[in-house]
């Protein structure tokens, strides 16, 4: 690999890392290309050389994070697990990605249609994992419709908790703080 190619890859990686930190601290909508260039100590033109538009840069970061979240969710939330282990793993994955998910849902109305579709697909995948887990652990016999109504009720509460997050630090996990309430709701709905 040539020196120029290596330098381009390092610059691209730097832009992605610094922009991800800015997004973490300020949200997707409040990050400007000027701030990104200042944070990276490069010109705005370099950002556009690598990503063409700020939207492409943000989409790259968001889609990468969505992919990582979906991968971890599928690895940790295996439908054949007991309900308790499944729920514990789900909450652990949510806590791991809490700041990202909170920002994502707060800015959802302003994101591109392609990103919204990716998020909807992720939600469908998650709901299907829950449905399969419920079917594999039939403590309470629910119809398919009732199962999905209960799953939607559960997710709306998790979603609300993510929207309530105000301070974006690793130590300030709203899901961790409300874990007991989330578990209690889950048990009320599914046991």
Identify the function of each model-found stretch.
Residues 1-26, 33-39, 56:
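Basic, helix-initiating cap at the start of DNA-binding domains
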Residues 92, 128, 132-136, 153-191:
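C-terminal peripheral helix-coil segments that are non-catalytic and often amphipathic
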Residues 15, 53-61, 68:
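Short amphipathic alpha-helical segment with a characteristic S/N-K-E followed by hydrophobic residues
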Residues 27-28, 48:
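Short amphipathic helical patch at the helix-1/turn junction of helix-turn-helix
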Residues 60, 74-100, 151, 179:
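Hydrophobic alpha-helical connector segments
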Residues 40-51:
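Short hydrophobic/aromatic patch on the recognition helix
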Residues 70, 113-140, 145-149, 180-183:
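Amphipathic alpha-helical packing segments from all-alpha helical-bundle domains
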Residues 94-117, 163-167:
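Amphipathic alpha-helical segments used for helix-helix packing
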């Amino acid at each position: 690999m040539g020196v120029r190619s290596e330098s381009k890859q390092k610059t691209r990686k730097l832009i992605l890392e610094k922009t991800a930190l800015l997004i973490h601290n300020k949200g997707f909508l409040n990050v400007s290309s000027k701030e990104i260039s200042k944070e990276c100590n490069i010109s705005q033109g370099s950002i556009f050389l690598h990503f063409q538009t700020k939207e492409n840069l943000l989409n790259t970061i968001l889609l990468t994070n969505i992919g990582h979240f979906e991968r971890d969710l599928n690895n940790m939330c295996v439908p054949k697990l007991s309900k308790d282990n499944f729920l514990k793993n789900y909450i652990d994955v949510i806590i791991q990605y809490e700041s990202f998910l909170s920002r994502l849902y707060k800015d959802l109305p302003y994101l591109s249609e392609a990103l919204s579709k990716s998020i909807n697909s992720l939600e469908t995948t998650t709901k299907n994992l829950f449905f399969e887990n419920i079917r594999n652990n039939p403590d309470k016999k629910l119809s398919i419709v009732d199962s999905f109504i209960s799953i939607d009720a559960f997710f709306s509460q998790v979603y609300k908790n993510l929207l309530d997050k105000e301070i974006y630090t690793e130590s300030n996990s709203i899901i961790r703080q409300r874990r007991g309430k989330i578990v209690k709701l889950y048990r009320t709905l599914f046991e």
